[in-house]
Amino acid sequence: MSYVLDSTATRHNLDAMAKFYLNYETTTYEEVAGKGVKQITFNQVNLESGSHYAAEDADITFRCYELLKEKLSQKPELEKVLSEIDLPMIKVLSEVEQNGALIDPEVLRIQSNNLGQRISGLEEKAFSEAGKEFNLASTKDLREIFFEEMNMPVMKKTPGGQPSTDESVLQDLARDYELPKILLEHRTLAKLKNTYTDSLPEQISPKTGRIHTSYLQAVTTTGRLSSADPNLQNIPIKTEEGRMIRNA
């Protein structure tokens, strides 16, 4: 209901809604259970604190529901979106999540090995281009090689006044220099390997043999679905490597 009324809001959890709609500060879970390594489970919380927390949650949930229901009743077009699209979609998405996505781990393993070989080859090319070995992930090393040893132009600086080596700078420099081009390709392949070909097989459920992502209805400002744990919607489609991962 909160999302349908305002999809641009950054948060739609109970704490945020209580603050925005009721001007009420809720008791946080950390206040009753602690945080970090010292956080306890809810069944270990003392009865008085736990009862207050649970009762407050129920009370604020009901109050927000009544208020949002009233607001929606004043906007029939949004009320229709909720009743005819968003709520029925919950059951559909639940079934999709439970069914999961069938993944072939052997295909991903082969792709991971291939990517690993290409990444190693790019590292050797980078070392050859620079005339020495260096840490491709080290901003300090890149600054030293780019701007001190190879005299590349400084395209922009960081807030701290240091020459930037972010992706936009690498893309600009790659027009005239080989090393930034190699680094961009290395980063692209390393991300594919770490995020997908290495990670996805580890997220296959041993019970179903499938990956069960979560589809989120109330996150994007445009109303489209998003995916998390893992994000299966973010696998690249424009590159050959991304399409190969999708084929798995």
Give short role names for the model-derived ranges:
Residues 244-248:
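Conserved catalytic alpha/beta cores of large enzymes that bind or transform nucleotide phosphates
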Residues 3, 8-240:
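Conserved "right-hand" nucleotidyltransferase catalytic core of DNA-directed polymerases
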